Amino acid sequence: EMAILYAAKKQSQTSACFTVMTGRRRIGKTALLLESVKDTRFVYIFVARKSEVLLCAQYQPVIQETLGIRIYGEIREFAQLFELLMQHSQKENFTLIIDEFQEFLYINPSIVSDIQRIWDQYHATSKINFIVCGSVYSMMKRIFEDRKEPLYGRLTARISLHPFTTTVIKEILADHAPQFTSEDLLCLYLLTGGVAKYITLLMEAKAFNKTAMIDYALSEGSPFLTEGKDMLISEFGKDYANYFSILSLIAEGKTTQREIDSIINKNTGSYLANLEDEYSLIKKVKPMFAKPNSRATRYCLQDNFLRFWFRFIFPNNAVLEMGKNHLLIEYVEKNYE
């Protein structure tokens, strides 16, 4: 990933580059992007879900200070700021990073069309290293991969950031606790799924063994307790209750559509298809030696952290609401594997 970012940064010295980075929340996208540009001039802006006018008021002084551009008057539309940046990039090479880019669709969907129009107008004579990143997979996929969307076909590079491998997780744990056991390593993998932020939280809390990891993850106030909900509600929107129920059933071992349909009492085929194709949260698994047209299809969660969250935290929310975290900790210690 870093090699792709460095290559784009170098190429942008003579011609404009447009890179998109996707990856789940907490995977380390922002840290990686900032590390790649730390020795160069860059503008970093985060798209919070607030009005376009307030965002422009927030971005304007950052742009002026970073690039030395004098901006007269109050700018109320992002398109005006983006055009100023593209015009400036004809004179000077710099990097523009827009974090949580998909949030523009909530704020003002026409911003995406404006960016396409301005990019098409200026990029041929520009020296900008333009990078956008986002963590809502379905929306980022639609923005950049749907032929009907304005920014389709504009990218020069694409990066999909994935969790750490078990080898890297082992190295991290060994750095902090050289005497770790295989049980400790397994717990770290099952709890975090290799997501950088979750591993960092545990290591900073000095939770180096199985017991300490589970205690930290499930204690009152732990960020792990709300993380699954925080991650996915914006993905699923008003239908989140149905999706959460399906994911919870899969996590606890109800892995066929027939089982899921019978419990939820409705046909979940379209939901399962969306979870697999649009959100990339589940995948089909067929038994070994099954015939190609066999209907013995099972589903499994692809994200280890979400598998843990939907198996233990989501269905036991009432226990947590009563403040009886210790009961859940005891249950998980006995059953988490």
Question: Where are these predicted regions, by residue range?
Answer:
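Pre-Walker A adenine-sensing motif
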Residues: 1-13
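Sensor-1/coupling segment of RecA-like P-loop NTPase cores
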Residues: 19-23, 104-107, 117-148
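Conserved lysine of the Walker
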Residues: 29
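Short regulatory helix/loop adjacent to the ATP-binding pocket of P-loop NTPases
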Residues: 32, 36, 138-155
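Conserved NTP-binding/hydrolysis module of P-loop NTPases
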Residues: 39-43, 49, 53-72, 86-87
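Conserved P-loop NTPase "ATPase switch" module shared by AAA+ and STAND
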Residues: 85-115, 136
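Conserved small helical "lid"/interfacial subdomain of P-loop NTPases
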Residues: 156-184
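Accessory nucleic acid-recognition modules appended to NTPase machines
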Residues: 198, 202-337
